[in-house]
Each structure stands twice: as C-alpha cells, then as structure tokens.
Design a protein with these regions (language model features):
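Short hydrophobic beta-strand element within catalytic cores of glycosyltransferases
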Residues: 189-192, 202
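Nucleotide-activated donor-binding/catalytic signature segment of Leloir-type glycosyltransferases, i.e.
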Residues: 132-151, 155
C-alpha cells in the first residue's frame, strides 16, 4: 500500500477541544513514517504507535526573514525605540499557554532592576486582548510596554527582531517554537521556560537562558 509520512509540528494540540486526542490518534495511526521536532512530540507519538518509524529533527534556524539586513539602529528607528533602551520582545500569536501574563506581572520588578527597559508585545491577540490590556493598566506599566497588535507580515518581522536585545518565551506548555529559530536567525538570545522541547534547543548561558516555568 502507499506509504504515508506525517510531519508533526505538534502531535497533540496545545489547546484542547472535544475529541481532539481521539481524532488525532485515529489519523496518526494510519502513518508509516513520522518527522517530529522535539523529544516531547516523539514521546507523545509513542502513546499512539508502539513502533513508529520516527525521525527527530528540530526546527532549523530561520534566516528567511532577513530581507533588508537592517542594522540595530535602523530597526530601532523604525519601531521608535532609542539606542539606549533595553528591548524585550514577545512575538507571535498571543495564547493563554504562552504565558504572557506572567511576563507582564514580572515587568514591575524588571523595571526596578533594569534601567530603561521596554517590552514589545507583537502579534495577534484573538479574543483575549482585554485581559492583557487590563493587566498592563493594573501593574501601571503602560510606559514600559509597547503593544503592536495584529498579524505581522514577513516583511515586517525583521525590524522587531533586529531591534531587540532578548526574545522572551514565558510559555506554560510547548513542544517547540519557531520563534526560537527566528531569534537565532537574527543572532538574538532567548529566554525560555523548562517546558516541552524548548530547553532542547537552548544552551543555557550561551544561546539564551532556561528558567523554571
């Protein structure tokens, strides 16, 4: 019979919906070969098939977004940030499991310890925008948080990564994330939590920082 190969970004979805695991198992049981991108996905796959033909291949570094080769100063001019600011970047679709609320709650302490720091939150909020805006007001960090809401087209990605000093992924759960590989493409360090496959692709103290979730 025809051999079927699955490339699994996630074996199981981050956000649950009725019958998701049942349907996932029914589909993946038909596979002959699998490519997964984290050890967590590999482990999840073994819950479905006892002997899958599986290859673990982490995300490659993404260089495709370096369209203009913007310098740090050029990119900061585009996002209206000064050369002296310490820029933190949270990038991508904002979802509950990505832990943005933890980063916002930590910002008052970060502001105390890091002079001239600003957090850029860049991405689509979906239906959850109001709770994050309220948290920003509650913590009185409006001046230190820049929200750029909406889908970011490929040509706009570069200016945010080229301008930042650190990319932050305070996730509560994850198998892996392409955001890390985008950051690496711009030679930017990342801060990730010890969840899923994120620690697999970050060398603590060298390519970034790995912290408790």
């Amino acid at each position: 019979h025809t051999k079927i190969m699955f490339l699994c970004h996630n074996v199981f979805p981050h956000e649950r919906f009725p019958m998701d695991r049942f349907l996932t198992k029914k589909v993946l049981e038909k596979g002959d070969y699998f490519i997964v991108q984290s050890k967590m996905d590999e482990s999840d796959l073994y819950q479905i098939k006892s002997d899958p033909g599986v290859k673990l291949t982490p995300h490659p570094t993404y260089n495709a977004f370096r369209l203009q080769n913007l310098s740090r100063s050029e990119s900061r001019e585009l996002i209206r940030a000064s050369k002296d600011e310490k820029i933190l970047l949270f990038f991508g679709f904002v979802r509950e499991y990505k832990g943005l609320k933890h980063l916002l709650r930590a910002m008052p302490e970060i502001i105390k310890q890091v002079e001239n720091v600003r957090l850029f939150v860049v991405g689509d909020f979906g239906e959850d925008r109001d709770q994050y805006m309220e948290l920003i007001r509650e913590k009185k960090i409006e001046d230190a948080v820049e929200v750029v809401e909406g889908y970011i087209p490929d040509k706009e990605v570069e200016k945010y990564f080229a301008a930042c000093d650190l990319v932050v992924l305070p996730y509560e759960s994850a198998t892996q994330s392409g955001i890390v590989q985008i950051a690496y493409g711009f030679r930017k360090p990342v801060l990730v939590t010890i969840v899923g496959g994120l620690p697999d692709v970050v060398t603590d103290g060298k390519t970034g920082y790995v912290v408790e979730s």
